Amino acid sequence: MTSNTGMLPLTPGLGPLAPSIYASNTNNKVLIIDNGGHTLKIATNNPSQPHIIVPNQVGKVKNEKHQIMGEELINYNDPSEVRSRNPMEKGYITNWGLEKEIWDYAFKRDDMKIKPQDYNLLLTEAPNSLDDLRKTMYEVVYEQYKFKSLYLTTSSTLGLVHIKQQLLQYQQQQHQPPLDASMISLLKSPCHLVVDCGYSSTHIIPHFQNTRLNYAIKRFNIGGKLLTNYLKEIVSFRYWDMMHETKLMNTIKEKTCFISKDFIFDIKRSQIDKLNSNLKIDYVLPNYNDPNNKTGYIKENLNNNNNNNDKNDKLNVNIEKDKDNNDIKSKEEGEEIKLNDEIKKDSTTTTNTTKEEDMEQVLSLVNERFTVPELLFNPSDIGMNQAGLAESIVQSINCTNSNLHIPLYSNIILLGGSTLFPGLKERLELELRKLAPEQYNINIFQPQDPILSPLYGGIRLAQQPDYLKYSISKQDYEEYGYNYCNKKFF
C-alpha cells in the first residue's frame, strides 16, 4: 500500500499564538512548563507574553565558586571551562533541589516575573514516571511553590493537541489549498502514534481519543544526549580531546549529521574515497577570542566540490559492482557493522590548514556524520540490547488492539529535537515498510517545530473553558494527598 512522509502545513497567520485561539480561559492564569531534559520551554496563557527557553542545567566555571544559568550559561565566553549539572537522569527529575534553582531563575526573569501562588500550573513529565519521583514533584508544586492547581501530562499529548488544532484552524481558513487525504485522516482519526525523540531517550506513545495507551508505550535509551556523547568519543579517539566540549559537539552534531537511507552503501562509499567524498564536511572550530566565531561553522571547500561531481559517479559504479559481487551484503542477510571496530580501523578525522588560514582548526567529518545518528535505528551498534526506532514502533502497535493497527500506522507523528536529522522521516518509512503488513498505509508527519509543538499545545489547552476541571487544586491535594493525584492523572 501507499506510504507518505509529510510536513504539516504552515499557514500564513496561523502561528502558535494566533489570536483566535485565545477565546475563553484568560481569566485564570496558567503557567505552562514543558520540562525537557535539555531545555525548559515556558509560557503563560497571556497572549501578550512571549515564551522563553531556558537551559535545564546549572553551570560552574572552573576556579570560580558561583553558579551560572540561563543566558549567562548560553553566552559564556569559553564553554569548555564550564562544568554543567542537569537535574534529570534518563528523562526524569531526580534532583528537585537543582531543578527548583532553575525554575526560580526562570520565574524571576524580566520577561516572566511569575508569582507561582497566582498561577495554575500545566507541567509535562516523561511517561511512566516512578511514584516516589511524582510524590516529590507534588510537594514542590503544591507545598513549596503553592501553585493554585496542577495539570500533569506528557509532551506527546500536548504536541498532538497542537497539531490537531493547527490542522483544524488551517481547514477553517479561506483561500487555502484543501488538506490531502492523509492530513484529513490525521485530523479526524481517534488513533495517533507519537514518536517523541528527545534529549534523554525516545518514547513511542500510542494515543486513542487523545488519551495515552500507557500499556503500549515503548522506550529505548537513545536520545540527543547519547548521540552527542558518542560523537565526542569518536572525535576524541581519532584526534582531539573533545570530552569537555559538550556544547560544541552538540552544535556540530546538529549542523552536520544526517540519517543515511542506505547505511551499508554510505559506509562503503566513505571508505573508498575518504578525502574527496561528497560525504566529507570541514568544520572550522570556534575561536573563543573571536566574537564572530563562538560556535564554529561549516567551511566551503570549492576544490573538493569541483572534483566530487566526477568522482562520485565512478564511486557509485564501483560500489554497485561490489554489490553485484556480494562484497556488500544487506543487513537482512546477516552482515553486522561493528562501529567500534570501524572506529579503530578507520581514522577519517583530520585537520586541514592553509597558509592563509594557518590559525584555523578544521575538523573533517565523513562517516561520523551518519554513523552517529544511525544509533536511533540500530542501538546494537554500540552494544545496547534494545530495539531501534522502527522495531519499537512495531512492538508498540502490536501491544494494542488489532482494530487500532491500521489507523496507528497511518498517523505517526514525530516530535522532539532528535527528529530533526535530515533523512529521518524517509529512512523510518523505508524501515517500517519492511516490517509492517503490506496492506497497511504508512503516513509519517512532522510539525514545523517539533521542539516547541508541545508548548504550543499546552498554550492551546490552557485556553479551553473547561481546563480547570482536568487539573487538581491545591485544596484537593491537601485534603486527599498524592495518591489522589496519581489516580486522577494516571
UniProtKB/Swiss-Prot annotation:
Presence of the UniProt keyword Cytoplasm in the record:
yes
Q: Which SMART domains match?
A: ACTIN (SM00268)
Annotated coiled-coil segments of the chain: none
Main subcellular location: cytoplasm
Q: What's in the keyword line of the UniProt record?
A: Cytoplasm, Cytoskeleton
CC terms in the record's Gene Ontology section: cytoplasm; cytoskeleton; Swr1 complex
Q: Which molecular function GO terms apply here?
A: nucleosome binding
* Classification via SUPFAM superfamilies: Actin-like ATPase domain (SSF53067)
Q: Does the keyword Cytoplasm apply?
A: yes
Domain of life assignment: Eukaryota
Matching entries from InterPro entries are given as: Actin (IPR004000), ATPase_NBD (IPR043129)
Subcellular location(s): the record lists: Cytoplasm, Cytoskeleton
Task: Quote the CDD domains the UniProt record gives.
Answer: ASKHA_NBD_Arp6 (cd10210)
Per the similarity annotation, which family is this? Belongs to the actin family. ARP6 subfamily.
Protein name listed in UniProt: Actin-related protein 6
| Organism field | Dictyostelium discoideum (Social amoeba)
Gene that produces this protein: arpF
